[in-house]
UniProtKB/Swiss-Prot annotation:
Function: Catalyzes the reversible phosphorylytic cleavage of uridine to uracil and ribose-1-phosphate.
Coiled coil residues, start to end: none
Similarity annotation: Belongs to the PNP/UDP phosphorylase family.
Disruption phenotype: Disruption of the gene results in a complete loss of ribose 1,5-bisphosphate generation from uridine.
Encoding gene (name): udp
Protein name: Uridine phosphorylase
Organism: Thermococcus kodakarensis (strain ATCC BAA-918 / JCM 12380 / KOD1)
Record field: catalytic activity: uridine + phosphate = alpha-D-ribose 1-phosphate + uracil
Superkingdom per UniProt: Archaea
EC number: 2.4.2.3
Principal location listed in the UniProt entry: cytoplasm
Amino acid sequence: MVEKFVSAERPQTEEGMQYHIACKPGDVARYVLLPGDPERVPKISSLWDEAREIAFHREYRTHTGKYKGVPISVTSTGIGGPSTAIAIEELAAIGADTFIRVGSTGAIQPGIEIGDLIIAKAAVRLEGTSKQYVRVEYPAVADLEVTLALIEAAESLGVRYHIGITASTDSFYLGQGRPGLNGYFPSFARNLVDDLRQARVTNFEMEAATLYTLANIYGLRAGCVCAVFANRVTNEFGKAGEKEAALVASEAVKILAEWDEEKERAGKRVWHPGMRG
């Protein structure tokens, strides 16, 4: 039997099952973690009190459960802006409103070690997806509450972290200042790392700019925490900090849930513990 979708504009079934992520209303919590790799989904959800697999369709794998009593979900986005935009569009359509990217990154500033975490307060829009949503001058910035929750979580867990501006690209190689094949290394790529380093950009990854742009224009909340796998200053590469990033993101959700309850009781539009009477 062919599954019936009710619209070509927003493909979904009558019960709201989304075309790409294969999730419907009620399947995900309002707080969703966003790794790129589907294999990271069970690694992240294994840190929670409980979790179950909701769907695994294409690159989109979703688990929903609870972390320290707070409903939470995780959905993989695949690599880059296009698939990330699809995930955000469809997750928001079924009730999610707060997103934290949990990924890996390459650092370009000195003093950042393999396994450290970087919390991105903003993103340079070097990718193309966000440009199909809004003018290039539009800033890609993280939500203040989410960023503060990530910082508080990192502090409470005692992990090494940095706060900075990421550069989101569509290319892992030339787009991040790495040489291509057969000696292809044009000047715009050769100079990219130095130019961004002078501008105090901290790292490269491939999804935050799309996430931040869409979250802001749609009235959602978003933040990003990444483990440093590559150090472009020392030319080192190693997979470290993945668990710590997942724990910080999960703990940030618990903190946000507490703040959201306090915010509602106080009748405020934004919240931070410093606003307690």
